[in-house]
Amino acid sequence: MPVISNPAVEKSTKDEGTASCSVRSRKRKADVTIFLQDPDETLDSLEMTKKKQYQDRGPWSNEMTCKSPHKLIPTPEKEEHEPNPTNYSHFASLRFSPVSVSPLPRLGWANQDDVWRNMLNKDRIYLRDKNFFQKHPQLQPNMRAILLDWLMEVCEVYKLHRETFYLAQDFFDRFMATQKNVIKSRLQLIGITSLFIAAKLEEIYPPKLHQFSFITDGACTEDEITRMELIIMKDLGWCLSPMTIVSWFNVFLQVAYIRELQQFLRPQFPQEIYIQIVQLLDLCVLDICCLEYPYGVLAASAMYHFSCPELVEKVSGFKVTELQGCIKWLVPFAMAIKEGGKSKLNFFKGVDIEDAHNIQTHSGCLELMEKVYINQALLEEQNRTSPIPTGVLTPPQSNKKQKSDRAD
């Protein structure tokens, strides 16, 4: 794999942004509303909702800086949504039983269970293989981590969104699973081309082709990128609309704060809380073992480490017992994040403050991975020497947690 150069900051403009008819539109404003947008919502009401968000949400309070991260997201109230009065019985022959109960609120334009099933189907249709490196004898898993870390840096330089990075990560992993005997000198070309495709799908003004070539310091020419683009899309069967890890996370976090909203239209949640949890996702995605778990399970398990079991079950539709394996796998990563300290929200010139948390940042995840490996070895040693298994952090019950907080 050629030496990856440090990206240079360039301004990017793009007036053209058409997508193939086989790919659904992924234009920005709200990842969570790709399929949840109400066409009848007026512009006035959207502005009112936007203003209310910033009036109600203040800066981080002192009580969020406690030792336990489980206070970051409030415990949900014990209420249930009213059943949708719309009669969908005449569609019964076209349905199948959902794997988990839909956590989505009632929607005025569609049945929330149908929307939820569609989301779950994405995880089943877009298959990934954590063992794909066995097909490539010349490659090592750490090469993937180095490549993804570099792509994060490219995204930060060009102010690309998190969804763009996670799309590129998905395209890269699924494409590599279809190939054999890829040499390491081709990895950077595959990676930058995956990001090129993702940017054209997700960004309103993606960087131009020559900028993607420039960022590789000439290692990948424009012709090579365009040729690889067609190869990747063909081998992926033109299936370019996965439900990414960060898309799942956006939905779960908005459901957690749905009681403050009138409509499930736009992502409205504290940005500071968002970046704390998404840092855990940015770190764990560098480990190829993350491909063992569905993206929805990864997002819900990451929330578990910053919340309580009741909330996770409510917003994700998964039982904690279903998430147990992934929760345990994430423990070394959560420990490394805690050791590294709290993330700060970065602001970018030309990017709205309300959209700042959606810009992919590069926070030195490769250095944190060294701590992850140390934590993994430590936990394995503890499991061998201790009769009680370690590795699963169980948050306290809500009532006990509140009493403990008051005592402090």
From Swiss-Prot:
Gene Ontology biological process terms, A to Z: cell division; G1/S transition of mitotic cell cycle; positive regulation of G1/S transition of mitotic cell cycle
UniProt PTM comment: Phosphorylation by CDK2 triggers its release from CDK2 and degradation via the ubiquitin proteasome pathway.
Entry annotated with the keyword Protein biosynthesis: no
Subcellular location(s) of the protein: Nucleus
Principal localisation: nucleus
Coiled coil: none
Positions where Phosphothreonine occurs in the chain: 394
Keyword Cell cycle attached: yes
One Pfam family here: Cyclin_C
SUPFAM superfamilies per record: Cyclin-like (SSF47954)
Keywords of this entry: Cell cycle, Cell division, Cyclin, Nucleus, Phosphoprotein
Record GO terms (molecular function): cyclin-dependent protein serine/threonine kinase regulator activity
Stretches the record annotates as Disordered: 1-24, 56-85, 385-408
Positions occupied by motif Nuclear localization signal: 24-29
GO cellular component term of the entry, any: microtubule organizing center
InterPro entries: Cyclin, Cyclin-like_dom, Cyclin-like_sf, Cyclin_C-dom, Cyclin_N, Cyclins_cyclin-box
Function: Essential for the control of the cell cycle at the G1/S (start) transition.
PANTHER family the UniProt entry points to: CYCLINS
Assembly mode: Interacts with CDK2 protein kinase to form a serine/threonine kinase holoenzyme complex. The cyclin subunit imparts substrate specificity to the complex.
Family to which the UniProt record says this protein belongs: Belongs to the cyclin family. Cyclin E subfamily.
Name the UniProt record assigns to this protein: G1/S-specific cyclin-E2
Organism: Xenopus laevis
